[in-house]
Protein backbone atom coordinates (compact mmCIF):
# COMPACT_ATOMS: atom_id res chain seq x y z
CA UNK A 1 0.00 0.00 0.00
CA UNK A 2 1.33 3.44 -0.92
CA UNK A 3 1.45 5.68 2.15
CA UNK A 4 3.37 8.68 0.79
CA UNK A 5 3.23 10.48 -2.54
CA UNK A 6 6.13 12.79 -3.32
CA UNK A 7 7.12 15.56 -5.69
CA UNK A 8 10.61 16.95 -6.13
CA UNK A 9 10.89 20.73 -5.75
CA UNK A 10 13.76 22.82 -7.06
CA UNK A 11 14.26 26.55 -6.53
CA UNK A 12 14.82 27.69 -2.96
CA UNK A 13 14.81 31.45 -3.29
CA UNK A 14 11.16 32.49 -2.70
CA UNK A 15 9.23 30.88 0.14
CA UNK A 16 6.03 32.79 -0.72
CA UNK A 17 6.02 31.26 -4.20
CA UNK A 18 6.77 27.84 -2.71
CA UNK A 19 3.80 28.20 -0.36
CA UNK A 20 1.44 28.48 -3.33
CA UNK A 21 3.16 25.50 -4.97
CA UNK A 22 2.94 23.44 -1.77
CA UNK A 23 -0.79 24.20 -1.47
CA UNK A 24 -1.33 23.05 -5.04
CA UNK A 25 0.65 19.87 -4.34
CA UNK A 26 -1.57 19.16 -1.33
CA UNK A 27 -4.69 19.68 -3.47
CA UNK A 28 -3.44 16.87 -5.75
CA UNK A 29 -2.87 14.44 -2.88
CA UNK A 30 0.86 14.93 -2.42
CA UNK A 31 2.01 14.15 1.13
CA UNK A 32 5.75 14.74 0.86
CA UNK A 33 8.01 17.22 -0.91
CA UNK A 34 11.61 16.46 -1.85
CA UNK A 35 13.65 19.67 -1.72
CA UNK A 36 16.49 19.45 -4.24
CA UNK A 37 19.40 21.36 -2.69
CA UNK A 38 22.44 22.08 -4.86
CA UNK A 39 25.87 23.22 -3.74
CA UNK A 40 24.91 26.70 -4.98
CA UNK A 41 21.74 26.62 -2.87
CA UNK A 42 23.81 25.56 0.14
CA UNK A 43 26.31 28.39 -0.36
CA UNK A 44 23.89 31.13 -1.43
CA UNK A 45 20.33 30.32 -0.32
CA UNK A 46 21.02 28.29 2.84
CA UNK A 47 19.43 30.85 5.20
CA UNK A 48 16.14 30.36 3.28
CA UNK A 49 16.02 26.56 3.43
CA UNK A 50 14.62 26.23 6.99
CA UNK A 51 11.76 28.57 6.01
CA UNK A 52 10.88 26.24 3.11
CA UNK A 53 10.86 23.24 5.43
CA UNK A 54 8.81 25.12 8.04
CA UNK A 55 6.27 26.24 5.42
CA UNK A 56 5.88 22.71 4.07
CA UNK A 57 5.45 21.35 7.60
CA UNK A 58 2.93 24.09 8.41
CA UNK A 59 0.88 22.93 5.40
CA UNK A 60 1.08 19.29 6.48
CA UNK A 61 3.76 18.06 4.09
CA UNK A 62 6.66 15.84 5.09
CA UNK A 63 10.02 17.08 3.77
CA UNK A 64 13.04 15.23 2.46
CA UNK A 65 16.29 17.02 1.58
CA UNK A 66 17.95 15.86 -1.65
CA UNK A 67 21.66 16.78 -2.08
CA UNK A 68 21.05 17.20 -5.80
CA UNK A 69 24.05 17.26 -8.12
CA UNK A 70 26.46 17.36 -5.20
CA UNK A 71 30.01 16.81 -6.46
CA UNK A 72 28.40 15.56 -9.67
CA UNK A 73 28.53 12.29 -7.70
CA UNK A 74 24.78 12.42 -7.20
CA UNK A 75 22.54 13.10 -10.20
CA UNK A 76 21.99 16.57 -11.56
CA UNK A 77 23.26 19.03 -14.10
CA UNK A 78 24.40 21.65 -11.63
CA UNK A 79 27.94 22.98 -11.48
CA UNK A 80 29.94 21.56 -8.59
CA UNK A 81 31.79 24.18 -6.57
CA UNK A 82 33.52 21.35 -4.72
CA UNK A 83 34.99 20.04 -7.99
CA UNK A 84 36.03 23.52 -9.08
CA UNK A 85 37.89 24.02 -5.83
CA UNK A 86 39.21 20.44 -5.52
CA UNK A 87 40.16 19.15 -8.97
CA UNK A 88 42.53 16.60 -7.42
CA UNK A 89 39.58 14.85 -5.74
CA UNK A 90 37.90 13.61 -8.93
CA UNK A 91 37.07 10.03 -9.80
CA UNK A 92 39.57 8.25 -12.06
CA UNK A 93 38.53 5.73 -14.69
CA UNK A 94 39.81 2.24 -13.87
CA UNK A 95 39.97 1.49 -17.60
CA UNK A 96 41.74 4.55 -18.97
CA UNK A 97 43.17 6.40 -15.96
CA UNK A 98 41.30 9.48 -17.18
CA UNK A 99 40.12 11.95 -14.54
CA UNK A 100 36.33 12.06 -14.63
CA UNK A 101 34.07 15.06 -13.91
CA UNK A 102 32.72 13.57 -10.66
CA UNK A 103 33.85 13.86 -7.06
CA UNK A 104 35.52 10.74 -5.69
CA UNK A 105 33.75 9.48 -2.58
CA UNK A 106 36.94 7.63 -1.62
CA UNK A 107 38.69 10.91 -0.77
CA UNK A 108 38.43 12.23 2.77
CA UNK A 109 38.05 15.72 1.37
CA UNK A 110 34.81 14.92 -0.45
CA UNK A 111 33.47 12.72 2.33
CA UNK A 112 34.03 15.54 4.82
CA UNK A 113 32.45 18.08 2.46
CA UNK A 114 29.40 15.89 1.84
CA UNK A 115 29.00 15.02 5.53
CA UNK A 116 29.11 18.72 6.43
CA UNK A 117 26.58 19.51 3.68
CA UNK A 118 24.11 16.90 4.96
CA UNK A 119 24.56 17.39 8.70
CA UNK A 120 24.37 21.18 8.42
CA UNK A 121 21.10 20.98 6.47
CA UNK A 122 19.69 18.40 8.88
CA UNK A 123 20.61 20.51 11.90
CA UNK A 124 19.48 23.86 10.48
CA UNK A 125 16.42 22.92 8.40
CA UNK A 126 15.10 19.93 10.41
CA UNK A 127 13.67 17.93 7.49
CA UNK A 128 11.95 14.59 8.02
CA UNK A 129 14.73 12.78 6.19
CA UNK A 130 17.07 12.69 3.23
CA UNK A 131 16.64 11.43 -0.32
CA UNK A 132 19.70 10.28 -2.28
CA UNK A 133 19.28 11.19 -5.93
Regions found by a protein language model. Name each.
Residues 3-13, 33-44, 96-116:
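The substrate-binding groove and active-site-proximal loops of carbohydrate-active enzymes
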Residues 11-42, 124-127:
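Catalytic domains of carbohydrate-active enzymes, especially glycoside hydrolases
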Residues 53, 65-125:
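Active-site-adjacent "subsite" loops/lids of carbohydrate-active enzymes
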Residues 42-47, 73-75:
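Extracytoplasmic/secreted cell-surface and envelope-processing proteins
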Residues 26, 50-60:
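Surface-exposed amphipathic alpha-helices with a cationic face
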Residues 127-133:
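Charge-patterned, long linear interaction tracts outside catalytic cores
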Residues 1-4, 60-64:
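Short beta-strand/loop segments at the ligand-binding rim of alpha/beta enzyme cores
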Amino acid sequence: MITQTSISYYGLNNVEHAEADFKEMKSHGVTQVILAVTEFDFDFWRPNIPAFVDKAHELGLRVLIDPWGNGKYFGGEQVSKFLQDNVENRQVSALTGEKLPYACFNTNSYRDYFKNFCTTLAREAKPDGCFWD
